[in-house]
């Protein structure tokens, strides 16, 4: 469930564009106006605002925001204003760069987005960067990491649903996974094939059979080798495919509780999940930490950056 709060009576894109244009004029930028508009519009509405702004003022709204804002506030507003597939393309490209290398983000995008949305992200990536995501991932990774990541970003995974699950296949592949993991054959082709090609519904059925038959979840079996980067990547993919809200809760917990806030992780999760399932993530965060997420963020951030995050969380005032 989305956390985004949209007012009952939405102004026309022309009105929103005019107010944003006014927010950029004068001696200082009206950050509050920017938050009050953009943080309360969905992706379609933000896209209309960008189009109307360009038509009326012959300027790119994103470039205007880039010129007027700075720091973490600029990043959260810019990421939020992008179309979701544009945003994911940008984050995926950023995650392959040597100076910001974060391959976990690639797994996150590949495994938590619906298949059609991820396909459109790859199209947006090609348009923006004149190369394919698959090519960039292959170029910027090596060894076992590449062996897992390239299939993850290459496959068009059928989303599937519970009534389409092949129970016999789930039982068989649960045994295959158990055999490979107990043998520590983590890079085995069958293991990678199962995790990168099966529908999410089929994988969930397989992993449920795994737990029922062998007494623990697959990630518990992988825990003893969790210091290995490849195994961590494997665990991340499994968590993203099966319990995305638990995965994102952990990212947020680490971003907030570490020595010094990880603003990039915090910004990424809030902007990418506010229109998807941030309410469920908030519930999981409260269950896990006994503190509401909005309060934790309010205590760990400040200024316009804090206000924008809280607005996207559905709590303009914490």
UniProtKB/Swiss-Prot annotation:
The modification Phosphothreonine is found at residues 100, 112. InterPro entries: Annexin, Annexin_repeat, Annexin_repeat_CS, Annexin_sf, AnnexinD_plant. Ca(2+) 3 binds at residue 301. The modification Phosphotyrosine is found at residues 129, 285. The modification Phosphoserine is found at residues 95, 290. One of its GO terms (molecular function) is calcium-dependent phospholipid binding. GO terms for biological process: response to cold; response to heat; response to red or far red light; response to salt stress; response to water deprivation. Ca(2+) 2 binds at residues 256, 258, 260, 300. Keywords: Acetylation, Annexin, Calcium, Calcium/phospholipid-binding, Metal-binding, Phosphoprotein, Repeat. Induction: Up-regulated by heat shock, dehydration and salt stresses. This is Annexin D6. It comes from Arabidopsis thaliana.
């Amino acid at each position: 469930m989305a956390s985004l709060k949209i007012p009952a009576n939405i102004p026309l894109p022309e009105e929103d564009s005019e107010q944003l244009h006014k927010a950029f004029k004068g001696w200082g930028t009206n950050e509050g106006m920017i938050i009050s508009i953009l943080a309360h519009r969905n992706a379609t509405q933000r896209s209309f605002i960008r189009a109307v702004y360009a038509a009326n003022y012959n300027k790119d709204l994103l470039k205007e925001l880039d010129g007027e804002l700075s720091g973490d506030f600029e990043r959260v507003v810019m990421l939020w204003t992008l179309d979701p597939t544009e945003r994911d393309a940008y984050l995926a490209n950023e995650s392959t760069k040597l100076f910001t290398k974060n391959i976990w983000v690639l797994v996150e995008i590949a495994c938590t987005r619906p298949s059609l949305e991820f396909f459109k992200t790859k199209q947006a990536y090609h348009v923006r960067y004149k190369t394919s995501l698959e090519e960039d991932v292959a170029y910027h990774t090596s060894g076992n990491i590449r062996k897992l990541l390239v299939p993850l970003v290459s496959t068009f995974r059928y989303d599937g649903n519970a009534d389409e699950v092949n129970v016999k296949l789930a039982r068989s592949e649960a045994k295959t996974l158990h055999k490979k993991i107990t043998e520590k054959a983590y890079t085995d082709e069958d293991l990678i094939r199962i995790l990168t090609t099966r529908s999410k519904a089929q994988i969930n059925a397989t992993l449920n059979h795994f737990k029922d038959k062998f007494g623990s979840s697959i990630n518990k079996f992988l825990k003893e080798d969790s210091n290995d980067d490849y195994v961590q990547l494997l665990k991340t993919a499994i968590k993203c495919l099966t319990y995305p809200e638990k995965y994102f809760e952990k990212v947020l917990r680490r971003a907030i509780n570490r020595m010094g806030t990880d603003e990039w992780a915090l910004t990424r999760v809030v902007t990418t999940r506010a229109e998807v399932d941030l309410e469920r993530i908030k519930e999981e965060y409260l269950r896990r930490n006994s503190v509401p997420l909005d309060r934790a963020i309010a205590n760990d951030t400040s200024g316009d950056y804090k206000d924008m995050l809280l607005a996207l969380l559905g709590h303009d005032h914490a």
